[in-house]
């Protein structure tokens, strides 16, 4: 599960162009959130660009790898999932591709992992948010309305068909952000860079 190239200080090139492009849209580089941090591919770069990085990852094994991959002093890791409500959930882990692990929608209210709204977390105002949660992006944004409207960050949202979850992302997450006044700054593959 631990990417040997990352652990040895190698370059993590997966999605690097979107990371670099999106960070350039930020006016400030104080605080970044990595929502769906997984094992830290994005987190590692964000720790180089921002003074504080808050990584949210609900899967314990992934958090362990994240901490090994990104031993940065400016990183805080949170052991919860995000969603539209404060509740409990379970995750479905996909063994062939850890990046496709996702919330089991049938367990909301009864699982073993805490789910919080971003609005309820009390995090400092973010300049940047990366949001890659395998089809759960819309629900996370619903639970982050006050936070997003307050700090007005650049947001990178993954938008694609998620074959493992069966969720077809029909653009609801981006539509909601646009209804709040955000606009599309750039599209790179399945990632949309949103700003104000």
Where are these regions (language model features)?
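Phosphate/nucleotide-binding beta-alpha loop and adjacent structural elements of enzyme active sites
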Residues: 1-196
């Amino acid at each position: 599960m631990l990417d040997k190239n990352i652990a040895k200080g190698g370059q993590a090139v997966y999605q690097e162009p979107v990371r670099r492009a999106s960070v350039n849209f930020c006016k400030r580089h104080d605080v970044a959130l990595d929502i769906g941090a997984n094992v830290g591919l994005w987190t590692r770069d964000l720790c180089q660009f921002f003074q504080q990085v808050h990584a949210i990852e609900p899967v314990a094994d992934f958090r362990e790898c994240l901490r090994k991959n990104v031993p940065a002093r400016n990183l805080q890791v949170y052991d919860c999932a995000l969603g539209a409500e404060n509740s409990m959930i379970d995750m479905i882990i996909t063994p062939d591709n850890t990046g496709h692990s996702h919330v089991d929608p049938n367990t909301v209210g009864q699982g073993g992992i805490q789910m919080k709204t971003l609005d309820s977390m009390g995090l400092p105002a973010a300049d940047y948010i990366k949001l890659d949660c395998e089809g759960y992006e819309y629900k996370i944004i619903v639970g982050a309305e006050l936070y997003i409207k307050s700090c007005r960050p650049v947001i990178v949202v993954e938008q694609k068909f998620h074959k493992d979850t069966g969720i077809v992302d029909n653009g609801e997450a981006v539509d909601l952000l646009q209804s709040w006044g955000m606009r599309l700054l750039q599209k790179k593959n399945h990632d949309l860079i949103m700003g104000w």
